[in-house]
Amino acid sequence: MKAMKKIVDHSDKLGIKYLTVYAFSTENWKRSVAEVSGIFKLLVTYVNSDLRELVENNVRVRVLGDYTKLPADAVKSLERTLKDTENNTGLQFNIALNYGGRDEIRKAVQAISEKVQRGELAPEDITDEMISDELTTGKLHADVPDPELIIRTSGELRLSNFLLWQSAYSELVFPQVMWPDFTPEEYEKAIADYQSRERRFGGR
């Protein structure tokens, strides 16, 4: 979690408004019990040790995903953090926990299908905005914009089920370093790469 702390701190210093870290996916439950338990222990340690600093730095913490399925101590620590930072107005730090892009799209489709079945909505009237509103970043966190830049560390060339709908026009950077070794310097390199690009949003 040291890398995460450094990146959160550096994002705040750079004036970045939104930062989302993919901490635990819906697929990660398939890992060994020991590995899953270790991830949650690290999460609880980070939240408990850095809560005061997050509050002092005006960082607001949000969770994307159903964190209530996590172990009780993790849920308790997260809920305390969410409550203690809910009125902060600086960097919004989103932690994706028990989150999956396909999972939230499926739930959005189900919710819209129910409206169609009840006669509240015609299929031809379904819009991109309606789907976006039913996603985790819409229904629960309407103020979270689509990501401009996605940084995938360790040289892996895939999104791993992360914000699939929202990342339609995101710029992607793939540093070769592993996440624990991802430094503020590497972070700034990725940002500089992004800033050198011309965003086209599918126009050409």
Each model region followed by its residue ranges:
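Flexible, compositionally biased loop and terminal segments
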Residues: 1-204
